[in-house]
Amino acid sequence: KDIESQGYIAPADCVEVRVTLDERERLVYATAEPEERYRLASSTDRKYRVVEALIARHPEEHILVIGQYLDQLHEMGERLDAPIITGETPVKERERLFEAFRTGEVRVLVVSKVANFSIDLPEASVAIQVSGSFGSRQEEAQRLGRLLRPKESGHTASFYTLIARDTVDQDFAQNRQRFLAEQGYAYTILDAHAIAA
């Protein structure tokens, strides 16, 4: 927070948006093996509508949709008509897409864990995290870090984390958020209905 107040990084609003699994998803989740539960909760269909609503809330901003599960990211890219960058994306294509994002030709970019490391996208002012590496504090900091480059406009960045309520997804999110709270970032918690009515 000290370096934020000195202008070295942008201020950020951190928002957790809680979705509720539908009846079918809850049944599948309840009967799943423990190691499958996080993936099921992270990939709930309810998150897609919330992502679309959040993008609509930020019509002029550069947005990163970040996740862990490739099938989820590919479906997200298709639904949003947005390009996808994963570890499978050739380096030249990644560079082309990153440049298109920087210049504004591409406004929404769907990215996997490759975005956690060594990319500089100061134009990004909104990140929507749909899934992550369990309770990784390092990953949370890296993803928030994508947004904290100083903005020419002095604009506040927005960091959204989409969580499936009453699941291990919510448990892991609390661990990641605890780290950011220790760094001085507060989370606002919203119900998905407040975003995607």
Can you say where each PLM-predicted feature lies in the sequence?
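Post-DEXD/H (motif II) to motif III coupling segment of the RecA-like Helicase ATP-binding lobe
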Residues: K1-E16, L180
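Short glycine-/polar-rich loops that comprise or flank the Walker A/P-loop
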Residues: I9-D13, P122-V126, E152-F159, Q183-A186
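Conserved interdomain hinge at the start of the Helicase C-terminal
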Residues: D13, R24-E78
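Short, charged, surface-exposed secondary-structure boundary motifs
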Residues: V91-F98, S136-G145
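A short beta-strand element within the Helicase C-terminal
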Residues: V108-V110, F117-S133, E139-Q142, S158-L162
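Conserved segment of the helicase C-terminal RecA-like domain
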Residues: R146-F179
